[in-house]
Every structure is written in structure tokens, then in C-alpha cells.
């Protein structure tokens, strides 16, 4: 079992938390799966509103400009020809959705990989609560400084304990995003340098991942722990 320190918002250790090796061990990192998850996420963000005019949409008559033979000029059927200026575009882009189906098991596997990677790099922090007595942006900035957040950070809170004061206090922090435990995505964990979870949020995520993890892998991890013990 991986043991993680639980801090308060002042950066002081107030406890510890054990995380299953089957979910958070460094050997759980699957870079290929992370790449697939990020590719799918970024594809789903594309608007897909690009469009070029087809033959029926460009302006111009459909009348043949001159007879087929006898003029010495190249044959032409319409002023809207794609070979001519102001003509239509052949096989041009049309509005479409770039989203595609991505299996839930693969998404959860990518989430396990992202969490294991953050934990192995020492970039995952667990706090007892993200709430502050005076939930102002300035106080949250000072708290993040005490937690040694120098660049960007992802704050993850339990959906059942999220308060409006936390949302208002964190929304104006530069380089900081607040998400719920049931909407955190592998892309978010890779995008931000630090990941700060409330204890309730990381416990909920660990429980969800354990329910959906392979029973074979869990059994193998448990056997490995017994051998080490």
C-alpha cells in the first residue's frame, strides 16, 4: 500500500492515507493509454464548424459558357467550375463532429495511469479539506504558496462537499482549475503541474477505480504485497 501524507491548507501534516498499489503503483502507468485518452478528449473539444461551399452553393450561372468544339479554347461546362476563381471546392471540409466512442474501461485505465504518474513524480497532494475560513482569492493564493504550488494546479473536491465559497475563492486564481471528483479527466491531470485532492475526493476516486479494476490485477497486487510482507 502506498502511504500519502494528508496536509492542511497551511502545508502541515495532519494525518496519512493508504492508497492501493494496484491502483496507484508506478507500474500502473500506461503511456499509450494516456495518449489515446488525451487524443479523444481533444477531439471532442473541436467545434467542427468548418465549411466550404459546394457546387450548388456558389454564385454563378450553370449555363455552358461556349460551345464544346470549334473555339480553340479549353472546354468548360460552368463558371462555377472548381478550376476557376470563385468556383466551388472539391471535397472541401463540411461541418461534422470529431467526437467518437471511447470505452469507459479505457478511460478509467487512463485515469489510473495519470494518478499513478502524478504520485510517482511527487506532484499529487492530499489535503484534509480545501475549505478556508475566509474563502477569498488572496487566502487561496497564500494557501497554495504554502503547499509549494509554483506554477499550475488542479484542485479536486468531492461533489458532496463542494461549497459556493470554494468556487468563488478559486475561480480567479491564475493557472488553477477546480473540478469535482466525478468529472476529473486524465487530460486535466497531465495538463496541470500539481494535483491537489481533498481527502474525501481521492477516497471516492479510489473506491470507484477499485470497483472497476480488473479482479485479476487486484488479486495479483494483493499476492505481491503478501510476498513483500
Protein language model regions, located:
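Glycine/serine-rich anion-binding loops at beta->alpha junctions
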Residues: 52-91
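Extended polybasic, low-complexity segments that bind anionic RNA or targeting/receptor surfaces
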Residues: 1-47, 93-229
